[in-house]
Structures are given as structure tokens and as C-alpha cells.
Amino acid sequence: MTPLRFVFGIHQHQPVGNFDHVFEEHTRDVYLPLLKLLAEREFFPIVMHLSGPLLEWLHSNHSKYLDLVSDLVASGKIEMLLSGYYEPILAALPRRDRVQQIGWMHEAIESRFGVKASGLWLTERVWEPELAADLSEAGVRYVLVDDRHFLISGFQRDQLHVPWRTESDGKYVDVLAIDERLRYLIPFRPAAEIASYVRELRSAGHQLAVFADDGEKFGGWPGTREWVYDKGWLRDFLGTMEKLVASGEIVMSTCTDALGAVRSGGLAYLPTASYREMEAWSLPSAAATRLGKLETELGAGRIAGQDGAFIRGAHWRNFFVKYPESNRAHKKMLALSALSRQRGDPEEARRAIGRAQCNDASWHGVFGGLYLPHLREAIWLNLARAERELRHGESLAAEVVDFDADGNDEIWVHSSRFSAVVSPVQGGAIVEYTVFEDGVNYADVLTRRREAYHEVSAHPVAQEKSDGVPSIHTLEQSMTLTELPAFDPHDRALFVDRIVSIADNTTIRSWAHVALAFAVVGPGEIVCKGDGIEKHFRFADDGSIAVTWMWDPARFDDNAAFATEISLSRPLDIEADPTATRSTMQVETVAKSERGFERTVQGESITLGWSASLGRAALRIRPYSRHSATGMEGRRENGAPTPTRDELHAPLPPT
């Protein structure tokens, strides 16, 4: 009987803007020990993907790791995989940007490892059919996707242990299916169980089995370091696989070797897809709850079976619908990418845009970094760098444009020093306020939303006892909350206006969801009005903003106050009439991560109020001078020290 070709692939990535200590800990605890043990046991050949942000950090901080990889590549023991260099979701990029991102990775691999790569690790396995043409144009011969992508199209599992070919616009790329069962077995189950499955595949006459998954599974996920290293799983696994090789049952293979040795299954057209959990995470909260109930009714056995692929969630791009914060960053990236192309694509701006295309801060699940302020900050920092380069020397201007692609116009105000977006359909709130010198979008405060897991966490799924270690998705189901967290009735922004009762602060009237008529009366002057309020913005070239409100005081009694809420990611200088009241609170979210539920400070809410009987209010905001003793560094609006990024993100105590 012919040996089964076994492909062992590891993908290793850290996002743009992640903490230095996270890079360091993963290199020390995961990347180095894994590679050293693979080399010690000669468990080769394998395939490997290193993302651009991780490559850059390793080059500066752990070049010996890259030297080891380079030696193994040179000896034919490692086949390197491409991706978009800064680990973008390729489907979410303009087509030219996709090809350029892959081109950067081509250059990096050839420069550092001396080889031309031809296979692609598809970030988060987010596939769209048109990608085939762009991958082919970028010099990609083959791409790895989940076997589920095929199952959704009606393929049988038994058909997936061979390469397939797909096409778009007359261009072709080969597709290899990653075996989902292997992903769930490795490294969570004993080596003997994995060997049994591999033998089962060979006995069925299959020629190829592909495992490719996160390298962080081998010591970076909760509980895995003890299991993989201290309890000896990795040594047991390598020893077991060595015996399978020695007995002629399997042969280790690269993807390229497999393409040459295993005949193609033919033509396959795959639908838009990602992995099962990702599609569930992208659903709105209510829909995700319904999907969970449906899966429970069908039972784990049926979901894991052939029909389970037809029970699925939403498109990855639905995160842009679910989270406006993600959408704004994405649409800002698209706008700047187009502007950069129009202006000759200066290298500094293009690289900053490329870094801002890193995927992690765009989505949220048990993985995903949308809830992590430092990852969103890194995206906005790079967008600020790009826009500063592109707008050098520009004077103040305002554009009326559907900035967020929601069918409603916004006003984009910008100069050589700042960029801001006013949303008339949100009562004239400012939804972006980026100061280029600071590299900060001060409006980047995540809204507190009800997530599906907030509802179900009071009824966790019990973990079955086993002789393995639970996967991250099993741990996800067992997390619990003792109480539901607070959530916001509207999206957070700058200048969200309402009338409140002075007695108990309850809202009498809110303009958060009111669409106001608007007019741009000058380069930096905007008027929004309607439904009993008139709101004037005056933007200065240096980025300061003066806001004036007018309303009919006769519409409200003497016990009412006009209030505007300003949600800030970092402190700003706020000048208001001394008679204005002022209250502050931290904006904290409670979200699920691979470590459990975590409480994260997203920013600060500052509410200023005036008696409604006045009929008028005004204030001015501006960034603190970096050269001032009361500057942005080291203080908050209420005078308290600015917390470090580590202090902003902390786990909840066990429940």
C-alpha cells in the first residue's frame, strides 16, 4: 500500500502594535522550543508561515531564530509560505493592494531565506472566489483553505485528500484542503489517537493529509505549554510519527512535493467562507444566539458530520456591519489607499497603509483584537502617518462623502494636521478625530455592546473529562459571567447630545439617532440642524474644534439640562463655560478572549451640561501641546495619571 503523504504546517503571527513582551514570551515559550524539538527529531520536511510583523520583530530581537529557519530552508527541510505581508484579510483589500501585500512577502522571503515561495497561507482562511485571479497574478501557485470550504460546496470528505484547482477571470491556482479533524486532534489529543486517524486515512486509500494551523497552539494557548512540553505530548507525537514513517505508512511532505506526486481531483469553485467559529462570531448577537440553539438542537454528532457544513454563520465582512469602529477604520484605509495611488503612492504612506491593513483589530471572537485598544491604536497610528504624508502642505478643506458606505453622507474635514468625520445621521456627532502629530484617533472608543456570549455565559457547557487537553473552542464554551455587563444605547463618539432630567439624570430627549440636515458654509464651518437643535462646528487648521449649540428653551422645563457626551480614547483639552457641569466615567467593556472574560478600559466619557433654560451652549476642544507641562503624556482629563496600555487591559477575576 502506498504511504500517505503527511503535510505538517505551522502558521506563526503577532499583530501590528502588539506588546513587545507578547512577542518575547511567544518566541521564548512557543516558537523556539517547537522548532528546536522538530530539528532535534528531524521531523521534516514541514511548511511554515511567519507573518510580516513577526518577521520584523524577530529580525530586530531574535535573529538567531531566523538563522535557524534559514538553515532549515536551505537544506530543504522547511517550505516557506506566503501571505499578505502585514497579515491582512486579502478579501477585504483593493485588488492592487492584495497583489502588493503578497509581493512584499515574496521579497521578504527571498531576501531573508534565499528562496522563491509559491504557496500561500490564507489569513483566517477567509476565501472569496475572485481571490484566485489575484493570487495567480501575485505568483501564488497554491493556497491552503479549510476542508469545510469544499464541504459547503457539496464535496464529500473522501474527495478532499487530493489537490484541486480553482479559477477566476481565466487565472488558476491549486487548492489544498486542511483536514479539520487533524486540526482538532493536534495537539489536544494523545499521539496514539492521531496515529489511529492517520492509519484510517491510509486504509481508505487516501494519498494526502494536510495539517496546518497556528503555531501558538503548541504552548501559547491556555494549558497547552504544560501539555505539549511538560507532560511530553510533543515528544510522544514526534516519536509516534517517526514510527509511522519508519514502517512506510506515511511520508513527510511539503505542499509542493504533494502537488507533484498526487494527481489533481479536478476543478473546484469554492464559496465565500472561513472556518466555522469565525462565521459564527461575525453574526449579530441575536442571530448568533439562534445559531447556537440550532446547533444544540441538531446535536454535536450531526454538526460534526457531513451535513454540518451547511449550518453556518455570516460572511467575514459582516464584522464591518456588526462593529462600526471596525468599519470606520476599514473605510478610512480604503480612502487613503485610493488617495495614495492618485498621488504617486509615496513609499512611506503605502507602507503605513499596509500596516493598517493588519486584520487583528478588525474582528472579535475568542480570538481577534477589536476589543484590544492597543491594537486599534496601532491601526489608527498608521492611518495617521499615511494621511499626514499624503496631506503635507494642504490647507483646511471639507468633503461631503458617504465615508462609511452606509448610504448616508458624512462630512470629512481635513488639513495637513488633522482629519475628522462628522456624521449628520448621528445627530452631528464626530465619529473620527485624528491628530496627525499625536498619531491618535481621539474618537476611537469602543461602544459597549451586548454580545451573544453575554447571554449564554450563565449556562456554560460542561467539559467532559478526557486524557487530552481542551481546545480553545472547548474552553470558550465553558466560560461564565456572574452578571451581565453594561451596554450603551448608542454608538460612542464626540458630541452626542441629549436633554436630561437634573433630578435623576434620565434622558428626556436624545439626538444620538436623529438625522440632521447639514450645510458646509466654509472650509472648516459646518451647520447641522433639525428636530429642535442647531449645532455649529468651526474647525481650525491646527485641529482645534469650536462647537456651539442652540435650542428653544421653551420646549423644556426648568429641571432639564442640555448635555453633550464626549468619549475619548486619550485626554484632550476641553474649554467650556465655568457654569457647565462636568462628569466623567471610564468606559469599560467585558469581552471573551482565549484567557477567559476580560475587563478592558476603552477610554473615558466626559459629559458637560448646561441648564436647558439657557438655549445655548459652547465649548472648544484641542489636543494638549506635546511641549506643554500639562501635555497629553502623563495626565487624564480629570487630572489622574494616564494608565499604561497594560493597565487598560486586565482579566476579570475567576467566577
Where are these regions (language model features)?
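Catalytic domains of cell-wall/extracellular-matrix polysaccharide-remodeling enzymes
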Residues: 103-158, 217-237
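Beta-strand-rich recognition/accessory modules
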Residues: 402-403, 510, 515-533, 541-548, ...
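Acidic (Asp/Glu-rich), glycine- and aromatic
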Residues: 425-427, 432-438, 447-449, 531, ...
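Acidic-aromatic substrate-binding/catalytic surfaces of carbohydrate-active enzymes
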Residues: 24-28, 96, 100-103, 416-522
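Short, well-structured secondary-structure segments
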Residues: 3-94, 100-101, 118-122, 141-147, ...
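Active-site and substrate-binding clefts of carbohydrate-active enzymes
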Residues: 2-32, 39-41, 160-165, 171-173, ...
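Acidic, His- and aromatic-enriched active-site or binding-groove loops in soluble protein domains
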Residues: 65-82, 103, 115, 136-174, ...
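CE4/NodB-like, metal-dependent polysaccharide N-deacetylase domain
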Residues: 97-124, 199-211, 550
